[in-house]
Curated annotation (Swiss-Prot):
Name used for this protein in its record: Peptidase B
Top class in the EC scheme: hydrolase
Co-factor remark: Binds 2 manganese ions per subunit.
Entry-linked SUPFAM superfamilies: Zn-dependent exopeptidases (SSF53187)
Pfam family for this entry, one: Peptidase_M17
Binding residues for Mn(2+) 2: K201, D206, D224, E285
Protein's cellular compartments: Cytoplasm
Disulfide bonds: none
Keyword terms of this UniProt record: Aminopeptidase, Cytoplasm, Hydrolase, Manganese, Metal-binding, Protease
Function per UniProt: Probably plays an important role in intracellular peptide degradation.
Protein source organism: Pectobacterium carotovorum subsp. carotovorum (strain PC1)
Top-level taxon: Bacteria
Length: 436
């Protein structure tokens, strides 16, 4: 420990009255004490208090701390890091002693969840569709290279292989659209059944296309690949925790730009599964690229298909940035995810998805419209319903996550500005606890 290191300790006792009646942080000669405000150093309330206190400590410009005293188990240590970490500058934490298993888990989270946060925070100039795909491959090879094989398809090859949605959305950019199809197969058996397919939206920048976003909505659109990054991290963390089932990952990566070659309103996309889609809003592009990945996933006949995307503003309007929205016709799968979310202390909330939502996308010229009719305003539900048309067995084993909690445009009590990494641990837990 250096002279510049601040000690951080935990206490169930209230702060001295001079710090204020509801103070959760006090200072002495050695450093800071976090007062969790409960009789236990564990539990959801304590974790939230620790994370908020860590955010305050970082706000003081303190860049080197040591977690000292009792109570610094894995959960509390991770809560501290979640709040302490910021998008710029270096921070050093001297961790308390943990068991070998907990130390490995902490190090895996630091590598993988921080990779997710760093990747989402990258400016679009530094992260195009192909870079996103190769970064995902690099992470997964670093974790479990012997179990990984992959294929990258890009540009005109997408059109020739009938990935119509991804090619249509991405063709307006100088940076080619890319589909990453990655196979995690730790069994060593090339004929092993696929347990799960993960399909991620990887829009590395979203202008809205000709349905152009205003600057106030476009300024955070480097984060529109948050679903792809989250699923990559989830598979990597599950692999690091010992996942022995075969999982395939599909990342649908593109820019959504305005150019002479960009797609237009009224265009009709013809998908490999026979569906035709009329484009009536080029800013509803995420569902168009995900459709290609979902068709591929369905062809694998997996037990589960899970897609993750920063898909709609409607989900964010309903839940803010505090929860990921989840949609499914499969109650058992929803219950399994909610149990995993509870175990990992991550926020998910189910929103409605019913059979009637599937009929809210009428078109006079195609099978589907890429946005709901004006009379049907449940934007997040109809977006999920659109995706269901590209899942072969959509009523069982399919889960859609509209990941509203991936990114924050400004700092709040518990989070710095930028990516949060929320959802990675829950999805890793789900893959592990339900793989048979």
């Amino acid at each position: 420990m250096t002279n510049n290191t601040m000690l951080i300790s935990l206490s169930t006792q209230p702060a001295d009255a001079r710090w204020g009646e509801k103070a959760t942080l006090s200072v002495n000669e050695q450093g800071f004490t976090i007062h969790v405000g409960t009789t236990s150093l564990n539990g959801k309330a304590a974790l939230a208090t620790i994370q908020r206190a860590a955010r305050k400590i970082d706000g003081q410009g303190i860049k080197h701390v040591k977690l000292a005293g009792e109570g610094w188990d894995l959960a509390n240590s991770w809560a501290f890091w979640q709040g302490y970490r910021g998008p710029k500058g270096q921070r050093t934490v001297e961790w308390a002693d943990l068991s070998d298993a907990d130390k490995k888990e902490l190090n895996d989270r630091l590598k993988i969840v921080d990779w997710v946060r760093d990747t989402i925070n990258l400016p679009a100039e530094d992260l195009g569709p192909e870079q996103l795909a190769t970064r995902a491959v690099d992470l997964l090879c670093d974790v479990a290279c012997d179990a990984i094989s992959y294929r990258i398809t890009k540009g005109e090859d997408l059109r020739e292989q009938n990935y119509a949605g991804l090619h249509t959305v991405g063709r307006g950019s100088e940076r080619q659209p890319v589909l990453l199809a990655l196979d995690y197969n730790p069994t060593g058996n090339a004929d092993a059944p696929v347990f799960a397919c993960l399909v991620g939206k990887g829009i590395t920048f979203d202008t809205g296309g000709y349905s152009l976003k205003p600057s106030s909505s476009m300024d955070s659109m480097k984060s529109d690949m948050g679903g792809a990054a989250t699923l990559t991290g989830a598979l990597a963390l599950a692999a690091s925790r010992g996942l022995q089932q075969r999982v395939k990952l599909y990342l649908c990566c593109a820019d959504n730009m305005v150019s002479g070659n960009a797609f237009r309103l009224g265009d009709i996309i013809r998908y490999r599964n026979g569906k035709t889609v009329e484009v009536m809003n080029t800013d509803a592009e995420g569902r168009l690229v995900l459709a290609d990945g979902l068709i591929d996933a369905s062809e694998q006949n997996p037990q589960w298909i899970i897609d993750c995307a920063t898909l709609t503003g409607a989900a964010k309007m309903a839940l803010g940035n505090d929860y990921h929205a989840l949609f499914s016709f499969d109650d058992e799968l929803v219950a399994a995810l909610q149990e995993s979310a509870k175990e990992e202390n991550e926020p998910f909330w189910r929103l409605p998805l019913e059979e009637f939502h599937r009929s809210h996308l009428p078109s006079s010229f195609a099978d589907l419209n890429n946005i709901a009719s004006g009379a049907n305003t449940a934007g997040a539900s109809t977006a999920a319903a659109f995706l269901s048309h590209f899942v072969k067995n959509y009523q069982q084993g399919w889960l859609h996550i509209d990941c509203s909690a991936t990114y924050r445009k400004s700092a709040v009590e518990q989070w710095a500005t930028g990516a949060t990494g929320l959802g990675v641990r829950t999805l890793a837990n789900l893959l592990l606890s339900n793989a048979k």
